[in-house]
A protein has these predicted regions:
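Short glycine-/aliphatic-rich beta-strand segments at the starts of folded cytosolic domains
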Residues: 1-12, 46-48
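Short, surface-exposed ligand-recognition loops at beta-strand->loop->(often short) alpha-helix junctions
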Residues: 8-17, 53-55
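Short, flexible N-terminal segments of the mature chain
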Residues: 17-39
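Short amphipathic alpha-helices in soluble, non-transmembrane regions
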Residues: 20-26, 59-69
Length: 78
């Protein structure tokens, strides 16, 4: 999507971990959209995909780097 980047968060182990990603994005104040999860929304571990604004991509990467160390995520803005 124009003006948006894709955030990929791999190795999400449970719903609490997924909520920590959403909470981090909320704290940044970015307008994000959960696009999909693989394999499915209710199965774990999973990889979650979010659209985030291009102009927030660097802040999102920094925030997710901290969470990645804590939760073992494999997160990157594509």
């Amino acid at each position: 999507m124009l003006g948006e980047a894709m955030l990929r968060v791999g190795n999400v182990r449970d719903e609490a971990a997924m909520e920590s990603v959403r909470d981090a994005l909320d704290r940044l104040g970015v307008d994000y959209e959960h696009v999909r999860s693989e394999p499915e929304d209710d199965r774990f571990p999973q990889t979650a995909y979010f659209y985030v604004p291009d102009d927030s991509a660097e802040d999102v990467e920094w925030a997710l780097a901290d969470l990645s160390r804590e939760y073992g995520f494999d997160a990157e803005v594509l």
